[in-house]
């Protein structure tokens, strides 16, 4: 019998507390982070329930690609839901099945929430800037660049999100995962958590490549999008696009690597840098949400780049706050 949402939350809470690792999360507005992630949830992979996140991910547990395995993570916000603006030091608890070392868990959560970013340096620039000052003032608890641990997932989600709504992109992604995703661990332990909704890790590149463009179109993708997804998967599976090299590439090199793929343009490449490569200076100048936000703040199109130059090396964080200024906290695309 399927469990209720409240029962699921209780099970996740027990799992996270029973064997979790606690990590300080300064200047993190978890309510905002939860809304950001909920809006783009892929149900077969992840579940967000307010103060908790459960996700099946590919995690390199021995720092070698061949050691990557599907892991179920449970992340819980230990900060009280209602906080004052002075309470900026929160804590996150992370647990995993199969069990992982404390160091591996800490590294994962720091990366997912970009917790090692010195937001003080960004805010020092933003609070002096005529465009950003009123924007950052509206969120004193802090926004952080939320990261996907798998660059391949970020790449495919960016392609699937081209020129469609967030909901449509999530639906297509979920269909792909259900078709060729890798089954993940089903429970924390038999006496703690029964079967939970997220059941799969994101598909491996080879599995997506084997589908071929025709079967990808059967999932609701356009001809062009199916070709782009297949091309990206084939490039990664064959080694033409080396994800290990992409992770450590300079921004210019990362752009060259990504833009060499069919159907990948500047917006998609920048999105991958923002969401998977931890590039805090990535700036998607052509993003419609960013354009709307800057226009609403009185910055004309011919002054976008000049304004952005003042925000280096934090243009990615400036982008995040500008998106948030629109009210939704997310870009127009996926």
What are the functions of these language-model segments?
Residues 1-334:
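HhH-family (HhH-GPD) DNA N-glycosylase catalytic core used in base-excision repair
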């Amino acid at each position: 019998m399927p469990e209720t949402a409240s029962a699921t939350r209780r099970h996740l809470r027990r799992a996270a507390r029973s064997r979790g690792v606690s990590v300080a999360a300064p200047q993190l507005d978890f309510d905002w982070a939860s809304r950001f992630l909920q809006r783009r949830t892929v149900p077969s992979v992840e579940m967000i329930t307010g103060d908790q996140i459960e996700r099946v991910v590919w995690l390199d547990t021995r720092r070698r690609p061949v050691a990557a395995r599907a892991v179920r993570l449970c992340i819980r916000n230990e900060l009280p839901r209602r906080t004052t603006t002075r309470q900026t030091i929160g804590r996150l608890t992370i647990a995993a099945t199969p069990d992982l070392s404390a160091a591996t868990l800490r590294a994962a959560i720091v990366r997912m929430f970009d917790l090692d970013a010195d937001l003080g340096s960004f805010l020092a620039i933003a609070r002096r800037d005529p465009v950003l000052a009123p924007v950052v003032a509206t969120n004193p608890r802090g926004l952080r660049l939320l990261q996907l641990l798998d660059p391949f997932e970020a790449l495919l989600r960016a392609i699937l999100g081209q020129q469609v709504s967030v909901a449509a992109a999530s639906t297509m992604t979920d269909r792909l995962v259900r078709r060729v995703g890798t089954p993940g661990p089903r429970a924390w332990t038999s006496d703690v958590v029964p079967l939970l909704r997220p059941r799969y890790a994101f598909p491996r590149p080879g599995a997506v490549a084997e589908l071929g463009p025709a079967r990808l179109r059967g999932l609701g993708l356009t001809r062009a999008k199916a070709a782009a997804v297949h091309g990206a998967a084939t490039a990664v599976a064959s080694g033409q696009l080396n994800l290990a090299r992409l992770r450590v590439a300079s921004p210019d090199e990362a752009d060259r690597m990504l833009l060499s793929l069919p159907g990948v343009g500047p917006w998609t490449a920048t999105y991958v840098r923002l969401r998977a490569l931890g590039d805090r200076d990535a700036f998607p100048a052509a993003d419609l949400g960013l354009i709307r936000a800057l226009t609403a703040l009185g910055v004309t199109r011919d002054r976008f780049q000049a304004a952005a130059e003042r925000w280096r090396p934090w243009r990615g964080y400036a982008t995040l706050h500008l998106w948030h200024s629109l009210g939704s906290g997310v870009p127009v695309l996926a």
